[in-house]
Curated annotation (Swiss-Prot):
Any Pfam family: Ribosomal_L27A
Organism this protein belongs to: Xylella fastidiosa (strain 9a5c)
Biological processes annotated in GO: translation
InterPro entries named among the record's database cross-references: Ribosomal_uL15 (IPR030878), Ribosomal_uL15/eL18 (IPR021131), Ribosomal_uL15/eL18_sf (IPR036227), Ribosomal_uL15_bac-type (IPR005749)
SUPFAM superfamilies the record matches: Ribosomal proteins L15p and L18e
HAMAP family reported in the protein's UniProt record: Ribosomal_uL15
UniProt-recorded name of the protein: Large ribosomal subunit protein uL15
Subunit structure: Part of the 50S ribosomal subunit.
Basic residues bias spans: 36-49
Length: 149
């Protein structure tokens, strides 16, 4: 006789699953009275053990003991750095923020660009409305380029 296996006949292997512990049901159960929570303290209370991050038991927490130092400038997040040697890949002439974005030298999230000196520059550029470091400005001007605000 061949028995077919059906979904309603499936059950876990013997000893693979155990019943949920029913706590607070008398001393004979092993989990009566305090229900495995011990005596008193925060862990014995409902919602116990849930403490705020950084809480040190009433002691002044670390984030209040240490001094507040520095900050992150928002303008840095909106400014993209363009290395000066990458400008040599562009055609010589006028360069503005839109042309840098078209050349994919500036990400779409940036609101302004700044030229940083790195490498050499051989072509002549006229930069419109683009910031630069002192070294990059000197390098662009020595090649015959200029800046327009």
């Amino acid at each position: 006789m061949i028995m077919s296996l059906r979904l309603n006949d499936l059950k876990p292997a013997l000893g693979a699953s155990s019943c949920r512990a029913r706590v607070g049901r008398g001393i004979g159960s092993g989990l009566g009275k305090t229900a495995g929570r011990g005596h008193k303290g925060s862990f014995a209370r409902k919602g116990g053990g849930k403490i705020k991050p950084g809480f040190e038991g009433g002691q002044t927490p670390m984030q209040r003991r240490l001094p507040k130092i520095g900050f992150r400038s928002r303008s840095v997040a909106n400014t993209a750095e363009v290395l000066s040697y990458k400008l040599d890949n562009l055609e010589p002439g006028e360069i503005d923020f839109a042309s840098l974005r078209l050349a994919k030298l500036v990400p779409s999230t940036a609101k302004k660009a700044k030229i940083v000196k790195k490498g050499r520059l051989t072509k002549v550029f006229v930069l419109k409305g683009i910031e630069s470091t002192a070294g990059a400005r000197a390098m662009i001007e020595t090649t015959g380029g200029s800046f327009q605000e």
